[in-house]
Amino acid sequence: MNITCIIPTLGGGGAERVMLQLCAGLVGRGHRITLLTLYDAPDFYTVPPGVERVQAHADPQAQGMWARLKRVWLWRRAMKRTRPDVVISFMALGVLAAAWLLRVPYIFAEHLDVSKVRLSRQWLKWRLFLLNRAARVVVLSWRDKAYIARHYPRWKTSVIYNPAFAPQQRQLPRPPYFTAPHTVLAVGRLTRQKGFERLLEAWQLIQPRFANWRLCIVGGGEEKENLISLAETLDVQGSVSFVPPQKDLCAAYQYADLLVMSSRFEGFPLVLLEAMAAGVPAVSFVCNGPDVIIRDGTDGFLVPQGNTDLLAEKMAQLMQDESLRQAFGSRAREVCGRFSPEHFVQEYEQLCLAARK
């Protein structure tokens, strides 16, 4: 099959990495894959071998009806060049108007908690128009499927979890930003969604008891200065590192003692899958994704949403007990079997085959 995979950009993020993994997996199964990116932006990731790259060069900032029509025209022109049998789009719904105009079957994959998507009435109508013409809609949880079923046929909605890849078995040098004997790792865009201010508040509660530990937050975003200021206000700046986004976190996972997720909502976080695949125990607030990936009390801890006191308590429980960290970490590696890459690619391939019929 000729499959065109679409994503807004190849900027840093979990959905972008999942898309590249899907492209590589489909190429490995003998399909011709074209990756279409919609907007001009620096690439954070490298396109896998065997995947053709096409860029639409649309302007995401242009406003007004004519600007939107021009975007659809650019997308349609770029898509037509790829001659797709079927289209898979991650996080880019508007581009599917071009697929509809070309009469190409399309699959739309949402990579956020769909209940958190906020749209005006006008955009909601447009969204539903395009969704109801999709061959399939893919979501990341059964909760999302139940939510979207209010507007979209349940039988046309599929739940496909993101995959967990086993890390390479080789010793890597310790990351230079891991400057303490023990590290609590947090990774993600510095936005309100990720709730890092709550993590800093939890860290303040326990940090005096753990002089040999450091909190390392990896990521960039609009909240960076606010978070740095909050760390100073909480007087924890001496035990917290803010690290720019990293293309490869394998070494960080290899040396981290604990991963913490403080998100208000998630899709199916790749960071959590990767860390656990590397044997890192995790603590997370309950939300879509982590509540499926983490087995509470078996390979990590789940904490009621927003309970920073309990988040701090569960972090401390693991930080002070090396044997518990090792036991949780050993069982965490089982994510590679629970969410296998082979099953992930096969499910998308089956959807593409069904969409062509």
Descriptions of predicted regions:
Residues 281-284:
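Short hydrophobic beta-strand element within catalytic cores of glycosyltransferases
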